[in-house]
Amino acid sequence: MTRRIWLAAACLTLLVLPIGAQARQYRARLSPVPIDVAMQATIAGSGSVTATLAGNTLTLSGTYKDLRTAATVVRLHRGPRVAMRGPAVADLKATGGTMGTIAGTIELTKEQLDDLSNGRLYVQLHSEKAPDGNLWGWLFPQEGKKQ
């Protein structure tokens, strides 16, 4: 009897693990967001970032192009609400130049997981002439995209 219970528990575990282990996909469209009129002359470009959440590990990768000056810094930020700016929570890597790639892997806290699922995390790319941010993009779930 005990052997059957252990066997049933093992089978149930094998069935449940793949469901919980599915990765969720997120996407951000990077675009310029001028803070004031003076910034309109210094910011330009576009890009996109795809993020995969597996457990509490968020892996980001993306591209950007057509910046007016070279990229300097790219970070993951947390806004207090959707589409509101907030503090940086992690550094990402950019290849530099006026076009390139973005990459990073971050272990998210419970609070950051909640922020991600509620659209409060965003990617911000800075450039030489736009040190306060050149491109922004909020991470939103890709509907139906689980791995």
Question: What name fits each language-model region?
Answer:
Residues P18-V74, R78-Q147:
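Metal-centered catalytic cores of metalloenzymes
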Residues A8-V16:
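Bacterial N-terminal signal peptides
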Residues M1-A9:
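Bacterial N-terminal signal peptides that target proteins for export
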